[in-house]
């Protein structure tokens, strides 16, 4: 199986909230460097995606602003693809895992009705991400998997 984070997206992100998510993600990217160097980074009006730099890479994390269509990969992994989109990212707890957790925390904080998350990890695994998000983004997030 492996160490994996999961999320469900129920709708597209509000434009202003997405812009805030991208801005926070850019700040977080700077904060995790150099311990977590990122590769193949896209933080745009349409998508946030990244991986670790080889050999500290695993699966690419991808979050789309718009609701992905039902025919996307993983669409068959849930009962009703018209209701939500399921995705996951196996990080093997490599250094970029911290950034994956941070983006999921911020996304859920900004749009809790749009995205929910779950994890194979324990609360203690997520505490560094919670602390970093709260410090860098001036938010008050907590570990609250709700998927």
Which residue ranges define each predicted feature?
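Acidic (Asp/Glu-rich) sequence patches and key acidic residues
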Residues: 1-147
